[in-house]
């Protein structure tokens, strides 16, 4: 049996050994919920890696967005290079869900652009769970969305061995049954090709290798792994398990029953709509569903097959859907990273999905069973937890209430202590801030400034720029990739001060920042509550000169609690350093580029900006105008009128420059 083997140049330091011991003791004692309260920069991921190695259990790590999941996946891959570390997030680069807007009688068809690489990683994740136990899957909240039945998925695996008696047509039929398609010309994932007695299969979970099956009569003579590009043999195999090309795969016998069940539901719903006087809706539903039924009958698949998943799996109405968690064995471990963000996100998924789908059902676009293709309700998610570790610097009320044990990780391996916090009056705050910024820039350090309003952020940025400070403003309209580029430029010293409203999102791991200034700190509410203040203050905790200045004329309860908690941690850290003769050191961290797996389709073509329009040739401008006009029409068609207007303005600018 494969075991988790942790490989690292680090050893457990500070509070890490105690945290690992206490978490393992709690888990081995049978507790379902425990929390790792680890301060920023204390090495929480390394602690979790040590817990996983000690427990030797398949582990699901849930993060609250794709970017954070990709970062965690990269870190776990470094810690466990010999084990299966997988990545499971939504495979859509672009996703426009099916929707109906009654007010304008507008039906928006589902439109999506699937990232083939991420789809491959999803298949790799589910197949790994059936092949081994040393598996860590890092997932976004996509893991609570509907998937096909794990039993069906497992039973439909095509298992082939050397010496097995199986004729060619039987193997080909088996491949077609699990959603592989024959393509002798374009050999891609999820396809197979045939040349005489040689069958080559490109499994859904592979990237650059395929499986070649050589027959002698009705017997499998040889199985080899080949390079898909060159056809070079990479290795001999005695056995190969080919997993289905779709997570929604059903045997023919079950498919026939599902079609009957869909027809029955269609008949009932048509009667109901007619009684309600909805003749148009009834006709629409009949046409759409009958078309899908024909596709299922002939091809075994249809567009939007997930909306019939309840029938295909044979689940009763209202029952919870299968999801990634069902693919794990019973003794699995769950880790919820940044739980103060992730738990509320999981809690809110069901309601948003339900309101959109109910409109589709009410107006004859979908059968009521489509409502059962949904994310888990929060209560369903709770029931699926075996044993869970919540990881956060500021655990939310849910984690605090449910955890049988809260383990603190306050001491950082670097010896860094939480920053000193000072409250200063509002009067003269801008001049005071300017003076503090100059002190930092003289030492080649960086500054974060957080405000409460967009206008104040813009005005402050303009003022500091006029005063000769190299400053940037980060607002909510900037997408993830651009945010990460701004953060990278800050770390590289291309500018010194970053102003923003919500500077709590992922990626703000900045050892160069030695000052965090919080304006309007005494305005109680969102972004000025205790948890947000502690998170914001923590941004200065990776630099040995870290300091926090709050500007406010009063000290609110949230400020007091945040300052008291930070001071409590700081005292503990200083005492530990003195006892062990540790000198704090600023975190040394490479400036990484954005992880490629999370790049979205929009990043593949650089947008034209006023700066680079002047550099284009006439031919380049003409080609770009044609491309942007297509995008503008598409945006208008999808009711994205703001985007269409932006594209129109850009086209006009390009035409003017010609």
Curated annotation (Swiss-Prot):
It is found in: Cytoplasm. Transmembrane segments: none annotated. The keyword Membrane does not apply. Residues 622-657 form the UVR domain. The keyword Cell membrane does not apply. A motif (Beta-hairpin) lies at residues 91-114. One of its GO terms (molecular function) is ATP hydrolysis activity. Forms a heterotetramer with UvrA during the search for lesions. Interacts with UvrC in an incision complex. This is UvrABC system protein B. It comes from Natranaerobius thermophilus (strain ATCC BAA-1301 / DSM 18059 / JW/NM-WN-LF). The gene is uvrB.
